[in-house]
Every structure is written in C-alpha cells, then in structure tokens.
C-alpha cells in the first residue's frame, strides 16, 4: 500500500498492542496503568482494559513506559564539499530507534544563493524513501533577500515548517550580519516561527584560524584554539539581544560551553523567551580529546562550536539541564568517515565538522543526569521528548502518553548497563566519540506508529515507513508570552505641539572650520557669565537696567504638568 499517494513508499502496518504492567512516565506524573494501541494511536489507558481479540500483549513487568524520544537536531545524508555523511536517512533513523528515539527533526541546508523551497523538497525526497521513524524539518537560511523572504513564508504557510536556523559564523559562506539577523528575526516573529541560531563570532574565528595556521598549528587542536568559548558566548548574548529587540522567540542550537549556558540561564530569569539545546556530545564528553596523539581520534571530535576543553563542562551542562535553565536536547548527529575527515589532515579548517550521538542521546542523559540524582524520571521525559514537542507544536500528538496521542512509546530499563562501541552501534560511523563509556539506562522495547521497531536489542524496521510531520506556526508553549508582550509593547509618541522656536542653520557653518567658541585642543569647561552685583544698573527693587520691561516680584506662571503645548512660550 502506498503512503499519501507517493510511489514505492510502503505504509507501515500498525499492530494492535497492549502493554501490561508498566509504569507510565510523562513529564508531569508517573502512574501504573495498561496501554492499548490500535491504528498507530493510543486508544485506552487504565486497568482491566476491554480489548478486542488477537491483540499482541507486551509484559512491561513494572518497567517505565515513556514517550518516544524526539531528537530535534540531526544532519542525516548531509552533503558537504562533494561528500555525504555516512549515515543516510535509513541508517540514521535505525540508530535513532535503537536508542529510544522515535522522531527526528533534520536540518535542510541550502547552498548559498540556492532556493530554500527546492532544497526542502530535495530533503523530503531523500527522507520519504528511507526513514524508519517519523520526521520533521528545520530549514537553514543561508542567505537573505526578498525572494528568500517569500520562500520562508511559503514554507511556513504551506509546507509544515515552523523553525529556521541562521548562522552567526562561517564567514563568507553562511554568516549573517546583525542587520540581517534583525530583519530575519522580525519576519519570523510575524509568521509565528522559531528563530534558531548557530552562535559563534565568525569574524573573529576567521582571524584566529589564520593566526593558528601562521603559527604552524594545523591539527584538530587548532579547531578549538581558534574558537574559544568566549566567541560562542558573545554570539549567544548578541542573538538574545537582537531577538529581544524584535520580540522573536530564540532557540540556541548546540550549546557547548559554561559561558553560553550561563547567558541563556540569566536571560530566562529576566523573562526572555529563549531556549537552549545542548547536544549528546556536550552532555557526555569534552574537548580534551582534541590534543590526542591519534589524529583520527582527535578529528572525530571536531564540531562547531567545539567541545569545551574544560573537563568539568559536561557535568555543569547536565546540572543546568536538570534545573530547567536548558530545556531540550538534540544530537547534532553528523557522521563522517575517517577518510572524509582526513581531507583536513594538513589544515584543520578543512576537517568536516560533526559527531555521532543519535543512538546514545537518551542513555547519556539518563546516565549523567538521572542516575546521578540531578533530575528525576519526569524531567528526563521533558528534556528528551515533551519540551521538544511543545516547542515545535507537536504536543500532545508527540511527547505524551495519553489517549489520542501517537503510539510512539519506549519501555525503558533504568538498570540496564551497556558499553558503547563502534563495533556494536547501529551507525555507519567507524568511530564513536563515546567509545568505551559505560552507560546506565537503555530501551528494552521501542514502538513507533504502533509497531514494534526494536525488541531485545533486535531492530524490526521497514525502509521508507517514516512520515513527514507538519509543524504549525505559533506554538502556544512559545508564543503565548510573545503575543502578550506584543500587546504590551505598543509604542506611542508623546503628544506635543509643534516646535516653533529658532533652528540652527547648519548650512551656514564652515565645513572645515572650528565651531565658534571652541579650540582645536582638548575641550575646556566654559565659565558661565556672572552678574556683577556692584554694577550701577543692578537694583534690589527687581527692575534691572539691562531688562527692557518691568516684571512683577511675585508673578505666578500657571501651566499644566509638563508645560503648555507651545513649548517656546510660558505665558
């Protein structure tokens, strides 16, 4: 059977499933109940459910049943300098499902000056034929013009896209000026879309890269040395400032440093509508590996912004994720082979950027945050699924276990322990940046669209069964505050009369001359004129010799607060 009229794309056959004896964990509550699913939807939740015959029953045995994970940042089948990442939409979504993720949001990256709409359709074609789980798409704005503006509007209103990423780095390629950021944020806010930013100071990075190469530093360590965390933090602050001025919600992707986390946290405490997205790599490892003697290993960690060389950073980011200062997690999964990375063996600026993390994301967060007592199981659901669904207007279809929601579920075993290895992971990448790491917490059963996709470590997937999920504009979770602030922030001029006093004539001022009464040296304080009280014209009676008229000693001026409308006259 075809899917939505598309040829050669199979439609998934949903099973009638009953999960018994599980502990349902949503972002706001946990409780024991059974779940019945049919036609890809959750039909019943409760005890002693009455279900039709022929139902497949899964015994959860008291294990947690959580909403399927949503990975909000992936780069599958991404073109790069004539190459493509080794994980396409088939291999990448297989790895996602193996880790407990049932939906991804991938990034469309148009070439500079290329059509955003055409790039979007190209990504749709690639994904529709290969994905094994549901997906949506962000679209990156790689240049800005009136025609791009029209395309953005079309994508929002007709194509199901509600988020767009702009770059503050990659000078002379994707980097936007402050003026362009202001215009883009203003326009996205009017459409009800979400502005995402890759936050780094591209101008300074370009200078620092040249400096490193001049110093003879050509290896992967040059990548992090040319991109200190201050350059990420500066761009984060600038993006927050511009977004605030335009009253546009801001989503900071790939939060990698303590400084950036702190800025996002402070902005949220001040009431700014800003969201921060740490990724699997920044939550699970650090940038000390850039100095590895093994070039291939060091290159595997190259991504931008870079991982912090401060080894205490992952724990710090996990703490702020647990406290709510950061809200959502992605993987930024973009995998290249060692041979592909090696095109930059003599110049670190040419190393393709990207790390793995789509399969490890949920286990890394459980191990680093839940198993350590930083967050509870409900917060875990929030940062791996629910908050993402709310931000991108997918909730409660996604991100919640409730009647009517999609039957994307995971039976999660908090006691499972696995050792990460490139030999056993489902990615096509030959190196795993979490190699040898022992992680607590793993999925036992993964259900997507009401079908068992993974059970007992074995995948049961069908290529091309993933659906494109439309993301509507103006998500309440994001825009309720924006709308209220728009009403409160209406600006009005001060009502006043026309100024009818003298106006200085600039045309009469010599162009190259020095203004009268001043010198070309340092400015000096002018001494104000002082009336000589011994001058013969001075009188205590109130009538002065240098005044043309007689004034009353106690005349009172009556005027409304702020003065009369004619500001050149007091009478």
UniProtKB/Swiss-Prot annotation:
Its main location: cytoplasm. GO terms for cellular component: cytosol; growth cone. Keywords: Cell projection, Cytoplasm. GO terms for molecular function: hydrolase activity, acting on carbon-nitrogen (but not peptide) bonds, in cyclic amides. CDD domains: D-HYD (cd01314). One of its GO terms (biological process) is actin crosslink formation. It is found in: Cytoplasm; Cell projection, Growth cone. Residues 509-571 are annotated as: Disordered. Residues 516-529 have a biased composition (Polar residues). Homotetramer and heterotetramer. Necessary for signaling by class 3 semaphorins and subsequent remodeling of the cytoskeleton. Plays a role in axon guidance, neuronal growth cone collapse and cell migration. Belongs to the metallo-dependent hydrolases superfamily. Hydantoinase/dihydropyrimidinase family. This is Dihydropyrimidinase-related protein 3-A. It comes from Xenopus laevis. The lineage of its organism: Eukaryota, Metazoa, Chordata, Craniata, Vertebrata. The gene is dpysl3-a.
